[in-house]
Amino acid sequence: MRDIDPSLRREIESLERFLKVKPLYFDFDEGVFVWLDTRLIPFREVYRRTSDYRRVARAIVDMEIRGAPAIGVAAAYALALAAAEAASRGGEGFIEALSEARREIESTRPTAYNLFWATARVYGAVSEAFRRSGVDAAVRAGLEEATRIYVEDVRGNVEIGRVGARLLESGDTVLTHCNTGALATAGFGTALGVIRYAWMEGKDIRVITTETRPVLQGARLNVWELRKEGIPFKLVVDSAVGLIMSRGMVSKAIVGADRIVSTGHTANKIGTYMVAMAASRHGVPFYVAAPASTFQPDAGPEAIVIEERSPDEVRGVISEAGYVRITLGDVEAYNPSFDVTPPELITAFITDRGVIEPPFDVNIRRTLED
């Protein structure tokens, strides 16, 4: 799995100047997928490596890899690895094995639309190459399509940052919820990427990040990324958002998204709806930053599936010592991983295609079709 279009390698090299952190990538020399295990951040930086698509799927389930764009890239490479494994069967049973792997990968995280978008692209590329030229061409096509998705994500994230930075001014204090930086993408970030780009432009920006219970993506991952960038920040508990907005401590709020449908309804990390309501109540602009691959323009809010995760995530926290229980082990806990923010609470979407303003039911489709 080393033979790909040289232009793709050159494009990866040209984009690496934007990547202070490489959270995931494909090692073409060894033929393995590599990722930074985000469960261990900020205490340790450990990279995992595999050529087994099942291991990548498990990494998505266990949130070693998380964030919709990152999940999409990982799923793309997982299916490319599955194609390489299926090739050992020869022509007979190749598509059947690929389809089985696709179903397994798509079952990992039901809310993130990027996952389904990415696997559909890789599956289509592999199937077409197999039909035209056979197994070897199909394996190469899968790896190249996954790499295109990787390149598009980095390039798109940088463009989101450039577009969104225009909305920020020196002196702004920006609130963000959950991790939407390099660790949630192929390497630059969406909402946190907007903040990063504005900082790179020399704007005096300050950040307030929520801790983001129950998995603490803000307290663990945002803190790690913001400190690496040298961007000033404060960490607050999720339930402090209303108070700090009521005191005028927030200029703008920017979050990411896991799925955005045609109406503008937005699925994102649990607690986002609460942030949006507080922002609306206190007149704080509320932006959602996401690439085009997160939008599902042919679907309505009924298409959004809310993932429910293990109650143990609520019963305990991840610490430097590992998982630490904070309540009784038999307490009944409910753990929806996402909520849905209605479009009337959203000021605009910041995308790699530009800023999308209301009416969203018209402008989302128009922007994505241009």
Swiss-Prot record:
GO biological process entries: L-methionine salvage from methylthioadenosine
List of catalytic residues: D258
Binding site for substrate: R66, G67, A68, R109, Q217, N268, K269
Pfam annotation, one family: IF-2B
Statement: the UniProt record of this protein carries the keyword Nucleus: no
Site location (Transition state stabilizer): C178
Annotated EC: 5.3.1.23
InterPro entries cross-referenced by the UniProt entry: IF-2B-related (IPR000649), IF-M1Pi (IPR005251), IF_2B-like_C (IPR042529), Initiation_fac_2B_a/b/d (IPR011559), M1Pi_N (IPR027363), NagB/RpiA_transferase-like (IPR037171)
Source domain of life: Archaea
Alphabetically ordered keywords of this record: Amino-acid biosynthesis, Isomerase, Methionine biosynthesis
Keyword Translocase on entry: no
Biological role: Catalyzes the interconversion of methylthioribose-1-phosphate (MTR-1-P) into methylthioribulose-1-phosphate (MTRu-1-P).
Xref: PANTHER family: METHYLTHIORIBOSE-1-PHOSPHATE ISOMERASE
Similarity field: Belongs to the eIF-2B alpha/beta/delta subunits family. MtnA subfamily.
Name of the protein: Putative methylthioribose-1-phosphate isomerase
